[in-house]
Swiss-Prot record:
The keyword Metal-binding does not apply. One of its GO terms (cellular component) is cytosolic large ribosomal subunit. The gene is rplR. Keywords: Ribonucleoprotein, Ribosomal protein, RNA-binding, rRNA-binding. InterPro entries: Ribosomal_uL18_bac-type, Ribosomal_uL18_bac/euk. It holds the Pfam family Ribosomal_L18p. Part of the 50S ribosomal subunit; part of the 5S rRNA/L5/L18/L25 subcomplex. Contacts the 5S and 23S rRNAs. NCBIfam families: L18_bact. This is Large ribosomal subunit protein uL18. Coiled coil: none annotated. This is one of the proteins that bind and probably mediate the attachment of the 5S RNA into the large ribosomal subunit, where it forms part of the central protuberance. The keyword Ribonucleoprotein applies. Belongs to the universal ribosomal protein uL18 family. GO terms for biological process: translation.
Length: 117
């Protein structure tokens, strides 16, 4: 099994458990150049809030879009947008990525901005 297939298998297992809880989830995806985050409704059919380093507003705040500082900016932005829509608590879906580096930075930043998980 290759690295990507292993990550997808871990992500599927975690998403199944979150779906059983019926919780709104904060989904993180990372590539070498960008970081993406979405708050998805419990039924899985609606994106409540989203932020990524592709957006011009976030790209202008950071020097490079693929590092920890960029992930912190995305975490803060997605948390603020979710709170505006009335979402205060989420389940953190790391998409099979290790809770380390950019993924952890995004999570901590979202917590500091007021999102509970």
């Amino acid at each position: 099994m290759d690295k990507k297939a292993s990550r997808i298998r871990r992500a599927t297992r975690a998403r199944r458990k979150i779906a059983e809880l019926g919780a709104t989830r904060l989904v993180v995806h990372r590539t070498p150049r960008h970081v993406y985050a979405q708050v998805i409704a419990a039924n899985g059919s609606e994106v409540i809030a989203a932020a990524s380093t592709v957006e011009k507003a976030i790209r202008e705040q950071v020097k490079y879009t693929g590092n920890v500082d960029a992930a912190k900016a995305v975490g803060k932005a997605v948390a603020e947008r979710a709170l505006e829509k009335g979402v205060t608590a989420v389940a953190f879906d790391r998409s099979g990525f290790q809770y380390h580096g950019r993924v952890a930075a995004l999570a901590e930043s979202a917590r500091e901005a007021g999102l509970k998980f």
